[in-house]
């Protein structure tokens, strides 16, 4: 479902400037130098309205959570939420996940959260999924040895496709612990009694420079899904 355009977007973002990183590319390789008070940096791809973001940051005060959300109308709501709730160990970036290598050097991020991403239902769109092999290769380069991706979705075909994609790319899979923070979507789906599919994937042990070319990794087969009504 598309968000409605937020009125006064620019002034609202300016009021939350302390939470907004406008040029993350300038901090590539320098994040720990810029934020020395935090023991680790974690990344969230697609923060939506920030419910998960703020709760996860509160639970881990010695961690800086960097939330990437390409839809500025959603991101401003998340920033306002962080400001209102006094959550200081989170920063937001209105960028596309495809640009992650421009923003972070290898090994800078200890963990990546992907919560309820766009399933990109059409066959021609599968490579745009955040769990497609091309993205997984990017994550492997960004994460240190033992680094993980925590993935949640309500879309079973996407989940099954993602599990196969992780496996093809050499990631080790394990169940996600219970009691992780919820997104707004997750809370709504849980209230309705709908299933949520979760998995934790640990990056391959192969050094990033020895990763196979992404063109050598097959894209998992999947049936095209029908679009949901908005």
Task: For the regions a language model picked out, list residue spans one by one.
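Conserved beta-strand/loop positions that form the S-adenosyl-L-methionine
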Residues: 45, 68
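S-adenosyl-L-methionine
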Residues: 1-43, 51-58, 80-106
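Class I S-adenosyl-L-methionine
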Residues: 160, 164-230
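Conserved beta-strand signature within the Rossmann-like core of class I S-adenosyl-L-methionine
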Residues: 146-153
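Conserved SAM/SAH-binding beta-strand->alpha-helix loop
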Residues: 71
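A short glycine-rich, Lys/Arg-flanked "PGG" loop and its adjoining helix->strand segment in the class I
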Residues: 131-145
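Conserved glycine-rich SAM-binding loop
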Residues: 48
